[in-house]
Amino acid sequence: MMQLFYQNNKTGDTWDLATVSEKVEFKTTRKGSAWSVEITLYNSTKVAFEYGSPLAFKLDDKEVFFGYLTKVKYEKDTKTTLTFHDQIKYLLRNINFVARDKNVNQIVSAIAGDFDLKIGELKAPAVTLSPQLKEDKKALDIIQEAMDETLVQSGELLVLYDKFGELTLTTPKNLPIQYIIGNESFM
């Protein structure tokens, strides 16, 4: 059973949008972009939508996606389309960043703190990275460069993703499924 729990940030009211949805599209990407859920609803609903309000998507009681409302499109044919993105979207903004004697866990934590993002487990090797001086660069690119340098120094490949509302940094061996299927997977 699919559940799409939406909570309005201003009123605190909560709805299960699965009961009034016509179509649900879950989009994932391997790197460089945020995951998203796009929901098409019948306009007969009395739900008030506020940007930044959270959505929890569960399938058979398993946590699939947690994101925030970023787009509302009202259509003439009595439908509304909502788009929610996970926290990775906020890392696509350009920032200036300076760090010295830090490891990738500390860099992710510092950047997430600057954006007021929630952090989960950060399980990267604690190798000290070269000094970081970045100007007007995407926060996600800064993190990716730190992950790349950690790979070179430690030999450990790292994965950064939003695990149901918490930025998580780990190695593929710590993931529940250790296969990647897609255009770049060579499968």
Segments and roles (model prediction):
Residues R93-D101, S130-K134:
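Second-shell loop/turn segments in exported
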Residues Y74, L91-L92, P176-Y179:
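A short local loop/turn or secondary-structure capping micro-motif enriched for an aromatic residue
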